[in-house]
Amino acid sequence: MFCSFGLFLVSTQQQANAAAVDKQTQTQLHDYLKSHHINGVILVNGKGSQAVTIANNETTNKKKIVKANRLFPTASLQKIVTGTAIYQLTQKKQLEWDTSLNTYFPQIDGSEDITIRELMNHTSGLVNNDRPAVPLKGQKQQIAYMLEHMRNDHVHTWDYQDVDYELLAAIISKQSHSSYNAYIHRNFAKPLHLHQIKDFSEVAKKEVPQPMDPAVDWHQVTVTTSSDFGAGNLFISPNNYWKFIYNYVLKDPKMITEFYQESQKQEVAYFGGVYLMVTLSVLTVVFQVTMLALSLITRPRK
């Protein structure tokens, strides 16, 4: 196990305020971290919609201690950022859910049969699980690698593939006539005052909590993040990620409702980077816990 970060939010469709997590639940979450020897943090909603950090340290090594204001690799938690950016473009009438991938990448096999909607809900049929030998340098190289190594299974059923969101990031860049990273900074980081967000290429090793597993080195981290363009290339502190979710995502109940409605059209209730479900008329948005080589919570080796 390397690192991970999970964010769980509950919001009604009428009111975009996450419910506060009570003290008993906070204690239970801390007990879970401790009993499973997880070195990390969990952020939950507190009074006044402020983030409450629940932390557990399994080491005294300062290089490995996880903090809420320290950069971490977002891994698949970045997908909601990319999905939200795509939603913005639909609201500006710059693209639609039914817009064909062929509009942007006609060179991709079967692109005329793949829509933005299918990229958002992982039913495109596209697959790419390859990793480069060395970190990719810049967006141009990231897109070129993605296009070279993807394949189309021509089966439009649920298949969780990062390549879907890599393509969405490339579409954001093409549609906005700027780089993907520039779009994210201009539309999210700057207005929300997110100062702890960087592309992998800007991050120094010392800025990130190091894995407890000595088998995972910085080279692996940079290789993986560099090839997860739009789906894990950004490093964000838990606090800044919280600000994005609470001050942007949950402030837009229209977007959450639309994501929910779209998610119900397939076997897995997923759309725009999140799993969604309704329980007792409450829309529950679950921001997935990602157990990948780039996460935030670290476990000691046994």
Question: What is each model feature region?
Answer:
Residues 1-18:
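Sec-dependent N-terminal signal peptides of Gram-positive bacterial secreted proteins and lipoproteins
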Residues 14, 18, 284-289:
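Ser/Thr/Asn(+Pro)-rich, low-complexity disordered segments
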Residues 18-35:
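Short N-terminal segments immediately surrounding and downstream of signal-peptide cleavage
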Residues 30-64, 281, 295:
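A short, well-structured edge-of-sheet supersecondary motif
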Residues 34-36, 65, 110-113, 151-153, ...:
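Extracellular/periplasmic catalytic domains that process cell-envelope and extracellular macromolecules
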Residues 43, 156, 281-283, 291-302:
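Short, surface-exposed beta-strand/loop micro-motifs that present aromatic residues
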Residues 60-160:
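Active-site-proximal loop and beta-strand segments within enzyme catalytic domains
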Residues 114-280, 284-287:
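Short, surface-exposed loop or secondary-structure junction motifs
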